[in-house]
Amino acid sequence: MTIKVGDKLPDGTLYEMGEEGPKPVSVAELIKGKRVVFFGLPGAFTPTCSALHVPGYVAQADQIKAKGVDEIVCVSVNDAFVMGAWGKDQKVGDKVRMLGDGSGLWTKVLGLELDLIAKGLGLRCERFSMLVENGVVKSLNVEAPGKFEVSDAATMLQQLDKR
């Protein structure tokens, strides 16, 4: 079952690269009492993700946060080492938090698992964006396969303007 607007965002453990290696991040703790924008994508260092998706959120992070968003989080089915290296490559700084769902378990719980086995990429995350307020999904934008039209930073900004 896929997560939908009005649902409570399920807890899970994601990982980010810290000074001493990967460190766990509880989704429940991350969103508690906060307004958080999540965006998920199929993979680090892939063309659309690297050329458009992440750079869009980095470029518009200040505008998004000015709308009352506490944090912007990028999630991918990659490990913390890859997400950390990709964050440096994308120059995210403190604008976007790069969290890995290495096992894909949280992605699966959300119902946003993308099967790319036939393309040699394994099980990944669908491309999406989501606004979560105090643990509840307020907006959710899931892309059609192969598309990049509704999960971008500009769309999220428009949705934040309406809230």
What is the role of each PLM region?
Residues M1-R163:
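Chalcogenol-based redox active-site neighborhoods
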